[in-house]
Regions:
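Aspartyl protease catalytic core from the pepsin/retropepsin fold
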Residues: 15-31, 65-130
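Generic "edge-of-domain/loop-turn" microfeature
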Residues: 24, 37, 54-55, 99
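Intrinsically disordered, low-complexity segments enriched in polar/charged residues with Gly/Pro
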Residues: 2-7, 34-35, 61, 78-81, ...
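Canonical alpha-helical transmembrane segment with a positive-inside/aromatic-interface signature
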Residues: 1-42, 46-49
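Cytosolic, membrane-proximal regulatory domains of ion/volume homeostasis and mechanosensation machinery
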Residues: 38-40, 45-74
Length: 130
Protein backbone atom coordinates (compact mmCIF):
# COMPACT_ATOMS: atom_id res chain seq x y z
CA UNK A 1 0.00 0.00 0.00
CA UNK A 2 1.47 3.37 -0.98
CA UNK A 3 1.69 6.45 1.27
CA UNK A 4 -1.20 8.23 -0.48
CA UNK A 5 -3.56 5.30 0.11
CA UNK A 6 -2.55 5.03 3.78
CA UNK A 7 -3.05 8.77 4.38
CA UNK A 8 -6.38 8.75 2.60
CA UNK A 9 -7.69 5.79 4.63
CA UNK A 10 -6.48 7.17 7.97
CA UNK A 11 -8.45 10.39 7.48
CA UNK A 12 -11.76 8.71 6.58
CA UNK A 13 -14.66 8.84 8.99
CA UNK A 14 -17.40 6.25 8.50
CA UNK A 15 -20.82 6.02 10.15
CA UNK A 16 -23.68 3.54 10.09
CA UNK A 17 -26.75 5.28 8.69
CA UNK A 18 -30.42 4.30 8.56
CA UNK A 19 -32.59 5.79 5.79
CA UNK A 20 -36.36 5.83 6.45
CA UNK A 21 -39.27 6.62 4.12
CA UNK A 22 -42.93 5.58 4.40
CA UNK A 23 -42.15 3.02 7.10
CA UNK A 24 -39.43 1.33 5.03
CA UNK A 25 -35.79 1.44 6.12
CA UNK A 26 -32.34 0.48 4.91
CA UNK A 27 -29.02 0.58 6.75
CA UNK A 28 -25.79 1.48 4.98
CA UNK A 29 -22.29 2.74 5.62
CA UNK A 30 -21.60 6.46 5.10
CA UNK A 31 -18.46 8.48 4.56
CA UNK A 32 -18.32 11.87 6.23
CA UNK A 33 -16.81 14.02 3.48
CA UNK A 34 -15.39 17.40 4.46
CA UNK A 35 -15.33 18.28 0.76
CA UNK A 36 -19.02 17.60 0.10
CA UNK A 37 -20.91 20.89 0.21
CA UNK A 38 -23.87 20.17 -2.07
CA UNK A 39 -26.95 22.31 -1.57
CA UNK A 40 -30.40 22.38 -3.09
CA UNK A 41 -30.30 25.65 -5.09
CA UNK A 42 -33.81 26.96 -4.26
CA UNK A 43 -33.98 26.35 -0.49
CA UNK A 44 -30.26 26.15 0.29
CA UNK A 45 -30.84 22.85 2.14
CA UNK A 46 -27.81 20.58 2.42
CA UNK A 47 -27.72 17.50 0.20
CA UNK A 48 -26.17 14.09 0.87
CA UNK A 49 -25.36 11.52 -1.83
CA UNK A 50 -26.58 7.91 -1.89
CA UNK A 51 -26.12 5.03 -4.32
CA UNK A 52 -29.30 4.19 -6.22
CA UNK A 53 -29.12 0.50 -5.30
CA UNK A 54 -28.97 1.45 -1.61
CA UNK A 55 -32.01 3.72 -1.58
CA UNK A 56 -34.07 1.76 -4.11
CA UNK A 57 -35.86 -0.44 -1.50
CA UNK A 58 -37.27 2.58 0.38
CA UNK A 59 -38.42 4.31 -2.81
CA UNK A 60 -40.18 1.32 -4.39
CA UNK A 61 -43.94 1.67 -4.41
CA UNK A 62 -43.89 5.45 -3.88
CA UNK A 63 -45.74 6.68 -6.97
CA UNK A 64 -45.46 10.30 -5.87
CA UNK A 65 -41.67 10.20 -5.57
CA UNK A 66 -41.23 11.20 -9.21
CA UNK A 67 -43.29 14.34 -8.62
CA UNK A 68 -40.91 15.48 -5.88
CA UNK A 69 -37.56 15.31 -7.65
CA UNK A 70 -34.90 17.92 -6.93
CA UNK A 71 -32.24 18.88 -9.48
CA UNK A 72 -28.85 19.38 -7.85
CA UNK A 73 -26.07 21.02 -9.88
CA UNK A 74 -22.48 20.18 -8.93
CA UNK A 75 -18.84 20.49 -9.93
CA UNK A 76 -16.17 17.99 -8.98
CA UNK A 77 -12.73 16.90 -10.02
CA UNK A 78 -13.13 15.69 -13.60
CA UNK A 79 -16.78 16.80 -13.87
CA UNK A 80 -17.85 20.38 -14.52
CA UNK A 81 -21.51 21.38 -14.61
CA UNK A 82 -22.89 18.02 -13.52
CA UNK A 83 -26.47 17.30 -12.45
CA UNK A 84 -27.73 14.86 -9.81
CA UNK A 85 -31.39 14.10 -9.16
CA UNK A 86 -32.47 14.00 -5.54
CA UNK A 87 -35.38 12.99 -3.33
CA UNK A 88 -36.48 13.88 0.18
CA UNK A 89 -37.02 11.04 2.64
CA UNK A 90 -38.64 11.04 6.09
CA UNK A 91 -35.46 10.77 8.13
CA UNK A 92 -31.85 9.75 8.20
CA UNK A 93 -30.40 8.40 11.46
CA UNK A 94 -26.63 8.64 11.77
CA UNK A 95 -24.90 6.57 14.47
CA UNK A 96 -22.11 8.93 15.39
CA UNK A 97 -19.67 7.95 18.14
CA UNK A 98 -22.15 6.39 20.56
CA UNK A 99 -24.74 9.05 19.69
CA UNK A 100 -27.64 8.95 17.24
CA UNK A 101 -28.21 12.05 15.15
CA UNK A 102 -31.63 12.17 13.46
CA UNK A 103 -32.01 14.40 10.44
CA UNK A 104 -35.64 15.07 9.52
CA UNK A 105 -36.55 15.23 5.82
CA UNK A 106 -33.02 15.11 4.40
CA UNK A 107 -32.45 15.57 0.70
CA UNK A 108 -30.50 12.72 -0.91
CA UNK A 109 -28.93 13.01 -4.35
CA UNK A 110 -29.03 9.68 -6.14
CA UNK A 111 -25.85 8.39 -7.76
CA UNK A 112 -26.31 5.62 -10.35
CA UNK A 113 -22.94 3.94 -9.81
CA UNK A 114 -20.73 2.95 -6.89
CA UNK A 115 -19.46 5.73 -4.63
CA UNK A 116 -16.64 3.54 -3.32
CA UNK A 117 -14.83 1.26 -5.72
CA UNK A 118 -14.12 -1.18 -2.88
CA UNK A 119 -17.60 -0.92 -1.34
CA UNK A 120 -16.48 0.79 1.89
CA UNK A 121 -19.51 3.13 1.86
CA UNK A 122 -22.78 3.74 -0.01
CA UNK A 123 -23.59 7.24 1.24
CA UNK A 124 -21.59 10.47 1.30
CA UNK A 125 -22.59 12.80 4.12
CA UNK A 126 -22.50 16.53 3.52
CA UNK A 127 -19.78 18.27 5.53
CA UNK A 128 -22.42 20.37 7.30
CA UNK A 129 -24.71 17.54 8.43
CA UNK A 130 -24.24 18.22 12.17
Amino acid sequence: MNIYTRLKRSNCIYYDVKLVKNGKAVVAKALYDTGCSLREPVTGSIVHIVEYETIKPVLEGDEKAEQRIYVIPYNSVGKKDGILYAVKIDEMIVNREEQEVTIREPILAIYEGKLSGKGYYQIILNSEFY
